[in-house]
Every structure is written in C-alpha cells, then in structure tokens.
Amino acid sequence: MKHSQTKPRLLIAMRSELPEGFFGSREWARLNAITDIIPGFPHMDFDTAEGAEALAEADILLAAWGTPSLTRERLSRAPRLKMLAYAASSVRMVAPAEFWETSDILVTTAASAMAVPVAEFTYAAIIMCGKDVFRLRDEHRAERGTGVFGSRRGKSLAHLGNHARKVGIVGASRIGRLVMEMLARGKFEIAVYDPFLSAEEAASLGARKTELDELLAWSDVVSLHAPILPETHHMIGARELALMADHAIFINTARGWLVDHEALLAEALSGRLRILIDTPEPEPLPTESPFYDLPNVVLTPHIAGALGNELRALSDLAITEIERFVAGLAPLHPVHKQDMERMA
C-alpha cells in the first residue's frame, strides 16, 4: 500500500473477549501509529447498521476467532478492503471458497506463530505421556503415600519412559515440522507420513518417510498434525488403530475431524492404548462421554494452541504484517487460493 497523508482505516473484528488478550499498550501504539482504528471494536456482526458501516469504511481487516465470514455479499459492501490480517491460524471460516473466487484482497495468517505453542504442547505431551505421568499422578493421589515407589521402576513397566522411543508424525504441517525438529534434538527415532513430503525433505527433518500403515505399526507414539481436507476425514479409524502396538500413545492436537471417535473410544475402553485428546469430535464432547473418566485417556479443552500471554505472539505477527503492508513491503506469510487445498 502506498504512503499517503491519510492513514488506512482498520476494522478489528473478533470475539469480544479477545482484544484484552491480543493487545497491550505496545500493540495499540503500533496500530495507532500506522492506522486509523474504526471505533466500536471489536465488531462481530457485519450485517447490523453499525457493522455494515464499519465494513464499508475498512481498508484493512484485523480478524481472529469469531470474525464474520467474508461472503460474496459482504465483500460487495467492502469496496475499500485491501487486506485481511488474520491473527490466528486457519483462515477458512473468514475466507470461504467464495471469497477466493471474487476477491484479490491480500490475506496473511499468524499460523506460524500459532504453531509454536501447539508444537511445544505436543512435545511436552509426548514426554509426559511417555512416563504415564497423568495416570501415575492419579494413582499416587488415591494411594496418598501408601504405594510402593520401587514398583514404579520394575520390569513390568518397560513400556514407560522416553529412551529411544519411536515417534510417528502424521502430517508434515508447520506444527508437525516443529515437533520433528524438537524430537530430533533428543534420542527419538522419527517417522513421518505425508503424501506431499519427499523422502529427502523428511530426512532433512531428521525423519524417515513412511506410509501410514507402516507408521502406525512401528510407532511407540503417534501424533496427528494433518489438515482438515475431504480425504483426511476419519483417516484414523478402527483398522488403523488396530495396527498400533499395545501400550502405544495416540495424541491428537490437530482436529477431531481426522479420527473416528467411536473407534477411538472402543480402543480407549479396552485399555490397550494411552490417549491424549486436545481436539475431540464433537467439540466439546457430551457430558456423558466415557472419555472424561477413563484412566488411560488425557482429555484437555483445546488448549494446545495459543493461550493467555501466547496470544501476544499472534497479534505481534498480525501487526507486523499490517506494518509491512502499509509500508509497501511484501508480506511474510501470505495465503493464496491454492494454499487452501493443503492448509488446515
């Protein structure tokens, strides 16, 4: 965007609780230095009189969770809009298929910033689940000091621990690649399944490329990082889970879309696998779901992604993209129509 005496007008549209987490004094100062923020933010409805007026005035849209979808009709009411800066990961909800058919608006994403906490959470989950920390904590709490600590280190627990463990990564996404980089620094063997990844690329990440069935049968730990695509729906079902070894660990910090949860529940009820689910299907699970109570299941409420002060990493990147746009510089992380075929 070329410099002018008039600052571009910025529309902030996201869930009402998010600005407090996204923006501190530093972030507001950066935005005010380069844009004219449209009052009344955060706007959550582009179809009210106030929301429609704000959309019509906007040159830049700073979006996140809860931003209304930019349908063809809404785009027709946004004649000035030149940039969508998304301060989260997947832009699919804000930029649906019709957006790409009718718009040449620049789209940027903070997916690379979001990938960091998810990868950190996943790596920590691999370590913690490897030592069965959550189940042993529950047993220790119930025993209240009456248990025998020596029994925790006996031969019967050979499946516990992280020495030379074999970890299978399903999906060489941003997050999957970061997890592999973290694992490669330790004493892990790594395999990866991704039809878009070459064997050479896998090797550069410290992993070997395999087919899905081989990965499932080989791995002590399986971690999902594939995108939501028609062909990935329930890619992990009863047949695939049956390939996994007894005591293997199954981790999903991606999306419930990838897993047949009826099949996963059957395996969970058998006690054969150790399971961590951050993103179930449906989300949230119904109150009566057995997943909540099974000792071999760790269920977390979609917290692998940016949480608390981690939101500032997302807004920092989104604001950086806006600063670059206003200065006429190329974006760091643009999203194009063809990217949507493989992105989460």
Regions found by a protein language model. Give the residues of each.
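Rossmann-like dinucleotide-binding domain for NAD(H)/NADP(H)
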Residues: 107, 247-344
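Phosphate-coordination loops involved in phosphoryl transfer and adenosine-cofactor binding
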Residues: 7, 163-166, 247
